[in-house]
Amino acid sequence: MPGAGDGGKAPARWLGTGLLGLFLLPVTLSLEVSVGKATDIYAVNGTEILLPCTFSSCFGFEDLHFRWTYNSSDAFKILIEGTVKNEKSDPKVTLKDDDRITLVGSTKEKMNNISIVLRDLEFSDTGKYTCHVKNPKENNLQHHATIFLQVVDRLEEVDNTVTLIILAVVGGVIGLLILILLIKKLIIFILKKTREKKKECLVSSSGNDNTENGLPGSKAEEKPPSKV
């Protein structure tokens, strides 16, 4: 029967899917390399710039290998290479192509930092800088991240005029609304007090009228006792 055959294949299919998921899980949760949120950075000619790079691994690392490479439209070169023995060791440089480069990272205290500083920038330093990491503990799994550096004459100042105008307008509107609410509350308070005073005056005036007209309950109703 077709139904019986399908019933026998279903468990095998689910088992195969589960095994595939277990096989792919270490890949998705393993080695990661990051250069931060800003992948495009600018620096002034003649200054220095920090090129950040950190890595992480859920399975730890041993004899980890890293390198920084430079790539532009007409050049490619390895800037610096090194290794990290384990989590308790600092990075060790094995190759450096440019004396202007300094490794400033540390892997102690789980920082896993292999950032570099590039000094005395030149316009020719403009290009892509890629941080590569290979972890032998994860079957030589590799990962990388790239920063684009643009060397300029000077950094352009950001014009915040529009932002300041918007903030001023918004602040003015909020202040006006608060002022209107305060005035409204003040008017309501004054009207309430005025009504209370009018009510007191009416009650007092009514009492005086009763007294003058000799109505029951007034002093005019009282008579002196008659003499026998």
From Swiss-Prot:
Subcellular location(s) per record: Cell membrane
Membrane topology note: Single-pass type I membrane protein
GO molecular function, one term: voltage-gated sodium channel activity involved in cardiac muscle cell action potential
GO cellular component: intercalated disc; plasma membrane; voltage-gated sodium channel complex
Signal sequence extent: 1-30
Glycosylation sites recorded in the entry for this protein: N45, N71, N113
Tissue expression as described in the entry: Expressed at a high level in dorsal root ganglia, at a lower level in brain, spinal cord, skeletal muscle and heart. Expressed in the atrium.
GO biological process, one term: neuronal action potential
Compositionally biased region (Basic and acidic residues): 219-228
Transmembrane segments: 163-183
Gene3D superfamilies: Immunoglobulins
Family annotation (Pfam families): V-set
Segments in the Extracellular topological domain: 31-162
PANTHER family: MYELIN P0 RELATED, SODIUM CHANNEL SUBUNIT BETA-4
Disease with which this protein is associated in UniProt: Long QT syndrome 10: A heart disorder characterized by a prolonged QT interval on the ECG and polymorphic ventricular arrhythmias. They cause syncope and sudden death in response to exercise or emotional stress, and can present with a sentinel event of sudden cardiac death in infancy.
SUBUNIT field: A voltage-gated sodium (Nav) channel consists of an ion-conducting pore-forming alpha subunit functional on its own that is regulated by one or more beta subunits. The beta subunit SCN4B is disulfide-linked to the pore-forming alpha subunit. Interacts with SCN1A; regulatory subunit of SCN1A/Nav1.1. Interacts with SCN2A; regulatory subunit of SCN2A/Nav1.2.
The protein, known as: Sodium channel regulatory subunit beta-4
